[in-house]
C-alpha cells in the first residue's frame, strides 16, 4: 500500500465486492487504432470468456465507428500473461470479461480527422459507446 495506495484500495474493494467486467482504458503512443487487448493467453481463459469477448467487440463495433478488431497487440506480446497488469490480474482472479481498451494519442488511422485528430470529443463518444457494449454483455437474458 505504501508505493501505490490507490491501487491497493481499489484492489481490496474489488476483492470484497467481486467483478463482473473489468475495463482498463489507455492511450497507445505507437498504434494509431482503437482496439481491445484481452486475456486469451492466460491458462484460465475458457470458451465462455471468448464468447463474452466476442459479444463485447461485436457490440462495440456496432456502436462506435472508431473501434476495430483487425489491428492491436500481437498474440505473442510478452505482456499477454503478465498478471501484474490490471486487466490480466482481474480476468484471471475473477473469471470475468477483462480487457484493456487502447485508443490512439494522435489520430485513428482507420478514420482520420485531419482537422482535429484524436481529441476529447472522440474520447467522450468512445466512452459513451462502450457503455452499450458493456450493457450487451452484462444485461440479463
Stretches with model-predicted labels:
Residues 1-141:
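Structured catalytic-domain cores with a bias toward divalent-metal coordination
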Amino acid at each position: 500500500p505504501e508505493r501505490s495506495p490507490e491501487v491497493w484500495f481499489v484492489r481490496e474493494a474489488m476483492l470484497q465486492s467481486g467483478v463482473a467486467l473489468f475495463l482498463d482504458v489507455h492511450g497507445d503512443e505507437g498504434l494509431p487504432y482503437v482496439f481491445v487487448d484481452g486475456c486469451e493467453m492466460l491458462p484460465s481463459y475458457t470458451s465462455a470468456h471468448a464468447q463474452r469477448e466476442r459479444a463485447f467487440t461485436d457490440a462495440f463495433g456496432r456502436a462506435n465507428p472508431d473501434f476495430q478488431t483487425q489491428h492491436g497487440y500481437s498474440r505473442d506480446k510478452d505482456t499477454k500473461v503478465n498478471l501484474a497488469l490490471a486487466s490480466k490480474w482481474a480476468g484471471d482472479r475473477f473469471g470475468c470479461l477483462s480487457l484493456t481498451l487502447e485508443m490512439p494519442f494522435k489520430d485513428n488511422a482507420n478514420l482520420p480527422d485531419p482537422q482535429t485528430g484524436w481529441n476529447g470529443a472522440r474520447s467522450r463518444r468512445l466512452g459513451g459507446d462502450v457503455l452499450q457494449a458493456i450493457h450487451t454483455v452484462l444485461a440479463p437474458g
